[in-house]
Amino acid sequence: NARLRYYIGEYEWSLAVLNILKSSTSKLIANDAMTLSLLISDNLEYDTIALQRLSKADYYIYQQRYSLANQMLDSINMYNPNEVSMPYLLSRKAQIAMNDKDYELADSLYRRIYEGYSDSYIADKALLDNAILLERYLDRKEDAMECYAKLIDEFTASVYVAQARNAYRRLREIEN
């Protein structure tokens, strides 16, 4: 319901529902709610045009209309570039690249997020997604281990630390 309200541009309503979901018992649901809530609240204050385009791009992604989503994301980058929405925009472009099996592009987009926007609320997720990409799709286990280690060391409060720690141990055991 919150995401639907976000898609149709009812941001205040969406925020109200997301604030309830943030107290969810599931860490991942609460984290997803927090991510969307931060995206909306940050952009409501800064740039509502970019927020409208981001929500439209997200809706296209939901519909699996990736070409239209990419066009919408490119229009934000061209006409409304801002530091607030850029990490989220890059994560959406990486998601599309993954779907298109353009793994090298996805790798570079994830890197741009956690290297250029390390203070972003999605930098930890970008590190995790990149580690999984490197491990499973590009067969670069050493690079994946570095991403997992960076996530463990630099994002100690992340909900993804346990997953990263388990993956790191598994890869280290395979290596030895």
Located regions from the model:
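Acidic, polar-rich low-complexity tracts and alpha-helical solenoid repeat scaffolds
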Residues: 1-176
